[in-house]
């Protein structure tokens, strides 16, 4: 079984969104630079020495800037997989639609998004 390992939410203004979740829920945010497409890492629970959530069942996530050329910009989850190419194949066989090829997220692993059979944008990641 492949677990949910991350969430993502789009933002018109990533600074405003980071400020909101920090004030409302105590989340910690880390602004990444242009080499990571200005992504914002979000920590919702105390991490262990490897940066993974210490609390069972808890996940961390990120915010990304909304873009006119990106489909289905809604809150979504990221599913951890052992072999991203095999998971992409199974996704398509089950009726999903993979959105492009996996991209390397430096320090984390391979990442690709897909639409499920109901039109939800979901992503998968093969950790390093």
Locate predicted features.
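N-terminal beta-strand motif that seeds the catalytic metal site of vicinal oxygen chelate
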Residues: 1-20, 74-77, 81, 127-128
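Vicinal oxygen chelate
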Residues: 9, 30-32, 88-128
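Core segments of cupin and vicinal oxygen chelate
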Residues: 8-57
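Mid-chain, well-packed structural core segment of small domains
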Residues: 67-94
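Exposed loop/turn and edge beta-strand positions of beta-sandwich/beta-sheet ligand-binding modules
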Residues: 3, 57, 108
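Short acidic/glycine-enriched loop/turn segments that link adjacent beta-strands
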Residues: 35-39, 72-73, 106-110
């Amino acid at each position: 079984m492949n677990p949910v390992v991350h969430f993502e939410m789009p933002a018109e203004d990533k600074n405003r969104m980071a400020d909101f979740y920090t004030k409302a829920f105590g989340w910690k945010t880390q602004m990444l630079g242009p080499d990571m497409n200005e992504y914002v890492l979000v920590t919702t629970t105390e991490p262990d020495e490897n940066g993974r959530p210490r609390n069972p069942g808890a996940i961390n996530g990120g915010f990304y800037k909304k873009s006119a050329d990106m489909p289905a910009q809604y809150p979504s989850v990221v599913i951890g997989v052992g072999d991203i190419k095999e998971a992409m194949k199974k996704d398509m066989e089950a009726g999903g639609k993979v959105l492009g090829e996996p991209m390397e997220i430096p320090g984390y692993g391979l990442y690709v998004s897909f639409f499920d059979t109901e039109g939800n944008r979901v992503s998968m990641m093969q950790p390093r």
